[in-house]
Design a protein with these regions (language model features):
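Non-catalytic alpha-helical scaffolds and adjoining flexible linkers that form interface surfaces
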Residues: 1-277, 285-288, 294, 298-332
Length: 332
C-alpha cells in the first residue's frame, strides 16, 4: 500500500492493545474489509477525540487511512451502544469476549472479506445487549453458526460419516457430529452418548428455534455447551482463552472440553452452493444470524448482497469487567 487512501467502513472492535504511552492498536471486524488492525492515536488520553468509542465490543462507523503497516483511525462514531450493558453484566461480558475471540480466530487473513461473520457478530452482540435471552444460549447459537460459516456445521440429524438418517446416539467430535452404529464401530474411539435433549437443543440453537431452546433443562444446556466447546476446540486446534470463564446459566463453572480425541482424519465438509444452510446461514428462513435477537437484530438475506470490503481487528479484553469472587458471584 504505497499510496495513502482514506476510506470509511463500519466495524466491531474485537480487541485492543496498548501502543506506547497514549495510543492503541485496535483489531476490527469490518463489514466490507474483514479483519483489520489499525492504530488509534491518542485514544488513551483523557481528552481523546475518540472518547470511549473504541472499546472492545463497540459497533462503530470509522474513517481510516491506509498506513505502511497498520491503517490509522481518524474518526469514530458509535452505531450501537453495546459496551455499557455488556461491561456491567459479568455473564454477558464473558460471552461477548468469547464471541470476539472466536471472530478473530476465524479470520486468519487480514483484509479478507467476512461479511457474513461480521453480520453474525453484530447480531449476537445486539442480542446480548438486549438482555432478553440467556447469554450462554446466545453464545452457543453464535458458535454453532460461526462454525457452520467456516464449513464445520456439526451433523445433528444424520451420520457425520455416511449420512445415514437418524436418530443416532453416538456423538464423535473428530468426525463432526452424530454417528450411526456401523460408523461408530469402525474406529470411532471416544464417542460420547449425549442425551437426546442435548442434541435437540443444539439443533434448535443452530436453526434459531428459540421456543424449543428456552424450554431445555439445565442439564441439557450444560451438556450441549460442552459439546459445542469441544467441537470448536477441535476445529481451531486449540481452545479459546475466554471460553472457560463463561458463566453458564448463572453457575460459574468453567467448561473443560474433552482432552483426548481419537486420531481420525478431519471430515471434509463440502458447502452446497445452492443452500444457505450449508454455509451456516443460521435460520431455516435463510437469514444469517436469524433469531439471535428479534427486530433489528435479525439479519436479512438481502444484507448479503453488499459487496465485501476491508476491516480492522485487535484485542478483546480491555473493558473492565465486574469484579468476581471465586464462587462466581459478583463482588458487592
Amino acid at each position: 500500500m504505497g499510496q495513502v487512501t482514506v476510506y470509511r467502513d463500519t466495524a466491531v472492535v474485537l480487541r485492543v492493545t496498548k501502543l506506547g504511552e497514549a495510543d492503541r492498536i485496535v483489531t476490527l471486524l469490518t463489514r466490507r474489509g474483514g479483519r483489520v488492525r489499525a492504530v488509534a492515536k491518542g485514544v488513551r488520553r483523557t481528552k481523546s477525540k475518540f472518547g470511549g468509542r473504541l472499546e472492545p465490543f463497540s459497533h462503530v462507523d470509522l474513517q481510516l487511512y491506509t498506513g505502511r503497516n497498520l491503517d490509522i483511525v481518524t474518526q469514530a462514531e458509535t452505531l450501537d451502544p453495546f459496551v455499557p450493558v455488556l461491561a456491567a453484566d459479568y455473564p454477558r461480558y464473558t460471552c461477548a469476549t468469547a464471541i470476539a475471540e472466536t471472530a478473530e480466530r476465524l479470520t486468519a487473513e487480514e483484509h479478507e472479506p467476512s461479511l457474513r461473520l461480521y453480520l453474525l457478530v453484530v447480531s449476537a452482540l445486539r442480542a446480548l445487549s438486549e438482555t432478553r435471552r440467556e447469554p450462554s444460549m446466545i453464545l452457543d447459537a453464535f458458535l454453532l453458526r460461526a462454525m457452520a460459516l467456516a464449513g464445520w456445521a456439526p451433523a445433528l440429524n444424520g451420520c457425520a460419516r455416511c449420512g445415514e438418517p437418524g436418530p443416532h446416539t453416538a456423538f464423535h467430535i473428530p468426525s463432526g457430529g452424530l454417528l450411526c452404529a456401523v460408523c461408530r464401530g469402525a474406529g470411532a474411539v471416544g464417542a460420547a452418548r449425549p442425551a437426546p435433549a442435548s442434541i435437540e437443543l443444539m439443533a434448535a440453537l443452530a436453526d434459531g428455534a428459540w421456543p424449543v431452546a428456552e424450554s431445555a433443562e439445565p442439564a441439557a444446556c450444560r451438556e450441549a455447551s460442552g459439546l459445542v466447546a469441544a467441537l470448536l476446540q477441535w476445529h481451531l486446534e486449540r481452545g479459546l482463552r475466554s471460553l472457560p470463564m463463561v458463566d453458564r446459566l448463572g453457575e460459574f463453572a468453567p467448561i473443560a472440553p474433552p482432552s483426548v480425541f481419537a486420531p481420525i482424519a478431519r471430515p471434509s465438509v463440502q458447502a452446497d452452493p445452492e443452500s444457505d444452510r450449508s454455509v451456516g446461514s443460521g435460520g431455516s428462513d435463510g437469514t444469517v444470524g436469524a433469531a439471535l435477537s428479534d427486530g433489528a437484530g435479525v439479519i436479512q438475506a438481502a444484507d448479503l448482497a453488499v459487496p465485501p470490503v476491508p476491516i480492522v481487528i485487535d484485542s478483546y479484553a480491555t473493558v473492565d469487567a465486574p469484579d468476581r469472587t471465586p464462587s462466581g458471584r459478583a463482588a458487592s
